[in-house]
């Protein structure tokens, strides 16, 4: 019984010290921490000292403008261009969560994004393109962008293979 207690106490102490080291490590990798839903320049400037990388929700409009907004039916008339200007001047990376990417607009988006990266001299490696539509997202991957497929389930690792196939078919 003493051995079990000793092992238990040793594990708790070990876990405690591991937590201290892990917490200390968080500050050592600021490039791994992203500011989520940075959908206003005010929020970007407010948190710019702490975060060098940020995620922005965008909708691609009929006039080939990337509109910064979370909801397709809402616009605040904020273009993505100030964000490109910001990372051109200050460094960092930009995660674009595209809310309406599909096979009908992917070519126009690629053209517009190529123009923006060229105009602001931003390498593709500094961007992450996210969408729920894996087929359209594949085109971004083929063009050399880092991509992220959004899966809208709480625990995607617990999905059965049939559920994964069903989701992929719907996307």
Q: Which residues are covered by each model-predicted region?
A:
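Phosphate-group recognition and catalysis centered on beta-loop-alpha active-site segments
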Residues: 2-171
């Amino acid at each position: 019984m003493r051995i079990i207690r000793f092992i238990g106490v040793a594990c708790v102490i070990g876990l405690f010290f591991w937590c201290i080291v892990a917490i200390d490590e968080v500050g050592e990798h600021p490039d791994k921490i992203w500011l989520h839903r940075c959908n206003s320049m005010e929020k970007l400037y407010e948190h710019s000292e702490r975060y060098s990388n940020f995620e922005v929700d965008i909708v691609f409009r009929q006039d080939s403008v990337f509109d910064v907004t979370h909801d397709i039916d809402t616009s605040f008339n904020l273009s993505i261009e100030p964000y490109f200007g910001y990372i051109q001047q200050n460094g960092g990376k930009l995660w674009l969560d595209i809310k309406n990417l599909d096979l009908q607009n992917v070519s126009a988006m690629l053209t517009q994004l190529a123009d923006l990266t060229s105009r602001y001299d931003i390498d593709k490696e500094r961007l992450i393109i996210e969408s729920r539509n894996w087929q359209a997202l594949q085109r971004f991957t083929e063009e050399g962008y880092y991509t992220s497929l959004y899966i809208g389930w709480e625990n995607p690792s617990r999905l059965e293979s049939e559920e994964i196939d069903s989701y992929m078919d719907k996307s």
